Amino acid sequence: NLPMDVRFMLPSCVPATPLDEAGAVLDYRAIDPFYEHPRVQGLAEMMNYVGAVAADSQVLEKITAAQAHHKKIDGHAPGLKGMELNAYLAAGVYSDHECYDMEDALNKLRLGQYIMIREGTAARNLDALIPLLTPQYADRCMFCSDDKHPSDLLEKGHIDYHCRRAIAQGVDPIIAVKAATHNAARYYQLNNRGAISPGYLADFAIIDDFDHFHVQMVFKKGKLWYDGQVKPFSAPPIEETLVNRARDTFHLPRLKLE
């Protein structure tokens, strides 16, 4: 009951590769029950594009399970093209965030994928993909960070940084804001969000201008929650055992010089 939305995509590749060691092996049976949770939007980036193209049974089980729940399936297909890209899309992967240049992005757009324009800490693709933010292509584009360090979030911002940087390079502010809000909401089937209109939840922010994107006010479901400071709200108590588990996760024996 906090005044915010936090939504999830279920992991598609744990472990990340067959040779990797992880805390668990998550097949489709392990993740399938979580699709019933109202905050789960779909299956996260299908990194095993080789398995999808090769019709690996475990990969296809995860994809078909997501489809059975009418959920989105995000992609991860750097450089994939031709018949392999066709096969990947035919499996039911709806988006990709691994586009490094316009050629790759246009190949995927023409085949029906949505493009997540990534600007993170390590991978930074926004400048190369700025031409996507035009009326011809923008309706099937949205922003993502993929991986961004906390220090970068504090110093530069998150999706607001995408907007500032895109607008500074000449992108129409309406197109930039739409990629950050409306397009993402439509893609993830959050059909009562992403716009200010009758029938929509009144979730919106008021900024100072399109150059700085300093947030002045934040409304959630029509209620003002921030106007320079966060309004008081009641939060459920956090179990101490959960706090301790989150903090006590890294264990090494005492190191010696030799």
Stretches found by the model and what they are:
Residues N1-K72, Q136:
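Divalent-metal coordination cores built from histidine and acidic residues
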Residues E45-M102, E119, A123:
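Divalent metal-binding pocket/active-site signature
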Residues D5-R7, V40-G42, K72-D74, Y94-S95, ...:
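Structural preference for beta-strand elements that scaffold enzyme active sites
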Residues Y28-G42, Y88-N107, A138-M142, V171-D172:
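Structural recognition of alpha->loop->beta junctions
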Residues A55, G82-L89, L111, N125-A138, ...:
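Histidine/acidic-residue-rich catalytic or RNA/ligand-binding cores of hydrolases
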Residues L154-G170, I174-E258:
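Active-site microenvironment of metallo-dependent hydrolases
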Residues H76, H97-E98, M116-A122, Y137-G157:
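Short acidic/histidine-rich active-site segments
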